Amino acid sequence: MTIRGLETALYVEGLNASEKFYRALFGCKTLLADDRMRAMNIGDTNVLLLFKRGGTTDGEEVEGGFIPPHDATGQIHLCFAIEKDDVEEYQRVLDARNIEIISTVFPPRGGTSLYFRDLEGHLIELATPGICEIY
């Protein structure tokens, strides 16, 4: 059996602002949008789900079944994989958008991780190959 990641979820107050933030930063396309969520294509390998905080606590009937309730509070951490050659470009992009890189880590096994916060305070990491055994 094989398993891989498909979706990453963040819970936000400002759906429109968060959608614009991630589109501007990563150039991702919005796949689905409604009053409670946005689904965005991240690198053709993952879907970033932006849920309106509190908007999914009742679950939802959809064609083909029922999506159970879910929600989260506080700051969440997520990591996106980037190529080593793109680190400086992402540093420039973040700087141009006045997004502070709050930490840069060089793990002992190699690679680089850039950490910053999104509009809602979530901790976002951009990591190059070598940061861990599987990447």
Task: Describe the residue ranges of each PLM region.
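Vicinal oxygen chelate
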Residues: M1-L6, K29-E83, E89-R117, G130-Y135
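Short, contiguous alpha-helical
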Residues: D118-I124
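Short metal-binding segments enriched for Cys and/or His
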Residues: A127
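Conserved active-site tyrosine of GNAT-family acetyltransferases
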Residues: S18-R23, L94, G121
